[in-house]
Design a protein with these regions (language model features):
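Non-catalytic cap/lid and distal C-terminal segments of serine-dependent acyl enzymes
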Residues: 1-131
Length: 131
């Protein structure tokens, strides 16, 4: 298992984005869990305040964690498009970078508090993206 910290420029958000990724060892199309933090958290919250790395160690599940910047993971009319970033750009980017499975049955989304809202919202609006 590798814990990878990435800083890259998001086209959708028009700003740098920090990502933590837990990637299994080996090769292949990994199942993927997009894990969203709650209000006041950031892309490091799940790593520093939970045992997520222990839970997925020795599995074929990759975990992707981003910062929601307390914006509830929705597109803002007069602001940034976090929902579009989460459900389109992030999936495409991480799938290409890490060799994640393209099959919706292998892609999951979850969160707590604000992240739980973002996860349910994404799963309901884009059911074709998540298994």
């Amino acid at each position: 298992m590798a814990l990878i910290n990435i800083n890259y420029e998001s086209k959708t958000l028009g700003m740098p984005v920090m990502i933590n990724a837990i990637i299994p060892q080996g090769r292949g199309s990994y199942k993927t869990l997009y894990l969203l933090h709650g209000m006041g958290g950031d892309y490091t919250t799940w790593i520093t305040k939970s045992r997520v790395a222990d839970y997925v160690d020795n599995t074929d599940i990759a975990v992707i964690m981003i910062s929601g910047d307390n914006k509830c993971y929705v597109d803002n009319v007069h602001g940034r498009k976090y929902f579009t970033f989460l459900t389109e750009e992030l999936i495409e980017t991480c799938t290409n970078w890490f060799g994640l499975s393209c099959d919706r049955k292998d892609r999951y989304i979850a969160g707590m508090s604000m992240g739980g809202y973002g996860a349910v919202h994404a799963a309901l609006i884009k059911p074709d993206e998540y298994g």
